[in-house]
Swiss-Prot record:
Assembly with partners or alone: Part of the multisubunit TRAPP (transport protein particle) complex.
Any one GO CC term of the record: TRAPPII protein complex
UniProt xrefs under InterPro entries: TRAPPC13 (IPR010378), TRAPPC13_C (IPR055428), TRAPPC13_M (IPR055429), TRAPPC13_N (IPR055427)
Annotated protein name in UniProt: Trafficking protein particle complex subunit 13
PANTHER family the record matches: TRAFFICKING PROTEIN PARTICLE COMPLEX SUBUNIT 13
GO biological process, alphabetically ordered: endoplasmic reticulum to Golgi vesicle-mediated transport; vesicle coating; vesicle tethering
Family from the record: Belongs to the TRAPPC13 family.
Amino acid sequence: MEVNPPKQEHLLALKVMRLTKPTLFTNIPVTCEEKDLPGDLFNQLMKDDPSTVNGAEILMLGEMLTLPQNFGNIFLGETFSSYISVHNDSNQVVKDILVKADLQTSSQRLNLSASNAAVAELKPDCCIDDVIHHEVKEIGTHILVCAVSYTTQGGEKMYFRKFFKFQVLKPLDVKTKFYNAESDLSSVTDEVFLEAQIQNITTSPMFMEKVSLEPSIMYNVTELNSVTQAGECISTFGSRGYLQPMDTRQYLYCLKPKKEFAEKAGIIKGVTVIGKLDIVWKTNLGERGRLQTSQLQRMAPGYGDVRLSLEAIPDTVNLEEPFHITCKITNCSERMMDLVLEMCNTNSIHWCGISGRQLGKLHPSSSLCLALTLLSSVQGLQSVSGLRLTDTFLKRTYEYDDIAQVCVVSAAVEVEA
């Protein structure tokens, strides 16, 4: 009859402890009225308690610190630190001790050991200590694998390992929204506004040290999270930078294409990379966490084959007096165009000049500026409409209405600059 051999005990003992900051000790005050049976007994006990504050014994918060009593929570972006100790519990010398610590995630296995060299020998009641650090960059299940190999005095090679499983939680809920800016000319521009909503989903407050947007090479970014008062820059969130549990903050950024990219039509179209958010915070006793989002992408607005934008237009004009506007025509297609400009009058707007004139050939991603003259025969807020561009190659006409608005006043009213 086959009998399973007894499990062999190892000469070395492995201890693993997570290193975290201590917490403030809290005591529960127990008091009573002076006329009650205990009298001043409870008050005297609280005064003699070393964990209380002199003169404020009834407050729960003391001046003493306590070491962590459990593993606690680990959040994404924090640094996981652990103390590993291998102790020789036997009465003999152990040789060639190798301690290896690996962290297994859902996607990779990382070696966290500071040194992969074996220790020549370990005498009785001696130990080998190591401290490992790792910035957590994935959520979900993590397994710390600690393996120990050594050789006994009899030359027998021994090996054992232990597994420590823990969960990495998400500390912040980040949501982003993109808004396409509209200029004073009532036309969509290349500027983009990014709204980032950041919510603290942990159980403790956070100090938001930094929330910044790192733009891609195509954009320049302007933070809109502060105001200037009396020459001093003040945060829109006030002087306190704390984010309480389940509270949300909204950060706003304005992105504008760099000049070398904005002048090239067709580059900023379709799905474009905006950049990524870099968030740094601190929790109790200054423990720092950092989180970087993946590259944020947005769908750029489509302009069709030909884009018409206004470079200059007055806000207010006189009734029945000509005024000038400057248009910019951009070929957003990948082919050559031969354009003809037609100007169609409306009930209130009348174009001055020759309609049907040739603008010439326009290469892909090229632009041309065009000065036009028009007048209005009706007072009030009038919409500029009636421009038509025809590509003679494909016999295709592009219509542009409501491209801007002007305020038309009587000539007797002084127009302010």
